[in-house]
Regions:
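Alpha4 helix (beta4-alpha4-beta5 surface) of REC/receiver domains from two-component response regulators
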Residues: 68, 91-106
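C-terminal output/effector regions of signal-responsive regulators
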Residues: 135-176
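Short amphipathic alpha-helix used as the core "switch/output" element in two-component signaling
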Residues: 45, 67-80
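Short hydrophobic/Thr-rich beta-strand motif most characteristic of the beta2 strand and flanking loop
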Residues: 31-39, 46
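Acidic catalytic/metal-coordinating carboxylates
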Residues: 38-39, 65-68
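Conserved acidic segment of CheY-like receiver
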Residues: 2-19, 23-27, 40, 55-56
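C-terminal output helix
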Residues: 112-121, 125
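Active-site residues of response regulator receiver
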Residues: 58, 88
Length: 176
């Protein structure tokens, strides 16, 4: 179970309605907010409609494959950071290789133990959260560096003005 007042939102894309229902139920039982789509095109629309923390998608789907879905997510400036886990029924390594080549964060082969899939999803979500926090911290540090550089520039200008005033006063005292 996820210990958070706002559980992560998962988008599950699976053309087989029975498999989609089972996965949606299992992820919901694990504490996730689940949006289920049976078509990749409706999944893309859903991704643009509301922020999603992670996508779980079948590799082989009619119309738009899981590989193409991953590429669309990675090519979208708003969605590109969204983790994607692909599920493949292919028994050879080519499904995983193709998935990773397209930019998938993980590829899980069928049949799989659902508790392992949940653990993989939790792992990807934790990494995404860490990267997001790191980016936010870096942005805050960058802002502090800029602010401090401006403050130092202003202090330097004030010191230079004071130095010029001291030199002027020294010249006046030297003339007297």
């Amino acid at each position: 179970m996820i210990a958070s007042p706002y559980p992560p939102r998962l988008l599950i894309v699976e053309p087989n309605e029975r498999a989609l229902g089972v996965m949606a139920k299992r992820f919901a039982e694990a504490g996730y907010r689940v949006v289920a789509c049976d078509r990749p095109t409706s999944a893309i629309a859903e991704l643009h409609r509301q922020p999603t923390d992670l996508v779980v998608a079948e590799l082989r789907m009619p119309g738009l494959s899981g590989i193409e879905l991953v590429r669309m997510v990675r090519d979208d400036s708003v969605l590109k950071e969204t983790p994607v886990v692909l599920i493949t029924g292919r028994s050879d390594a080519s499904g995983a290789i193709d998935g990773f080549g397209a930019g998938a964060d993980d590829v899980v082969a069928k049949p799989f133990d659902f508790s392992v899939l949940i653990a993989r999803v939790a792992n990807r979500l934790a990494r995404a959260r860490s990267f997001r926090e790191l980016r936010e911290d870096n942005a805050a540090l960058d802002a502090r560096v800029i602010t401090r550089a401006i403050e130092l520039g202003e202090t330097r200008a004030a010191l230079q003005a004071s130095e010029a005033e001291l030199l002027r006063l020294q010249k006046m005292v030297g003339r007297a």
